């Protein structure tokens, strides 16, 4: 889900922290992926430079071409090195025959603790929501108190969905919040209208499901595993069109399977309430919904931001529950097919 469409939800504190293995550091897990991204920058059509305050800037679509593979790798960085993203063929939404498929061994920490775009960064006319493992070092969001997790890493990596380089004031804020030197900050910039931006947004399909489960007050500590997929939409030079398509990919084409502990009835209830179909705003391309609310995200039903189809398996009971469904016709209408 495009980062502008997300919102901070609240839920009761977890009874157990998600970092059951305290030695896990998102910053440490992601470091090899970031190093490889920078090393392969030319092949990935990225531009790497030192920006404001000597922060490392990775341009994945502003002046650089970027591409699908760059977006795939950036999506894995967003997951804090705890997940895998693959581009796989499908016949479900022809001619849009490629899915971003996401899996992670630690869905709560990877998706909510890292990938979720929850850190608001603003200065002057600049605004972006930060996602990625650096959020867990700053831990400015109340979410981290609920997760019982904070990273003590010394290298900060954030992904920003933006078409402009952040000003020095934003770098200063990140450095202060994370207690690091600005030169230890890496900012990966992925415009919504770029190929890399498209992939890394669509690859949030599992995160969107976790975020809604959080909003529905489902106990996050009961979520053991998860996989998800959504179709890769064509980018558009028009921001609103690009933003609408990336949202529609998840709302009408997203598929998520969660594996949970606890009563089978709770799994069934989650499956019923989780799909986008449960929202009052379901049924039109997101661009039309957004325009109908005068381009104000806060007027859109927050329950809309969820995958099209959801399966929840109660692993302690061997029962699975599926709700929602795909809308290939609406996908084609949104994508331009």
Curated annotation (Swiss-Prot):
UniProt xrefs under Gene3D superfamilies: Methenyltetrahydromethanopterin Cyclohydrolase, Chain A, domain 1, Methenyltetrahydromethanopterin Cyclohydrolase, Chain A, domain 2
Catalytic reaction(s) noted: 5,10-methenyl-5,6,7,8-tetrahydromethanopterin + H2O = N(5)-formyl-5,6,7,8-tetrahydromethanopterin + H(+)
Pfam families in the cross-refs: MCH
Keyword Secreted appears in the UniProt entry: no
Root EC class: hydrolase
Gene that specifies this protein: mch
Keyword Nucleus belongs to the record: no
TM regions (residue ranges): none
Protein name (database record): Methenyltetrahydromethanopterin cyclohydrolase
Pathway: One-carbon metabolism; formaldehyde degradation; formate from formaldehyde (H(4)MPT route): step 3/5
Cellular localisation: Cytoplasm
Domain of life: Bacteria
Chief place where the protein resides: cytoplasm
GO terms under cellular component: cytoplasm
InterPro entries, alphabetized: METHMP_CycHdrlase
Entry keywords, A to Z: Cytoplasm, Hydrolase, One-carbon metabolism
EC numbers on record: 3.5.4.27
Stated role: Catalyzes the hydrolysis of methenyl-H(4)MPT(+) to 5-formyl-H(4)MPT.
Family to which the UniProt record says this protein belongs: Belongs to the MCH family.
Organism: Xanthobacter autotrophicus
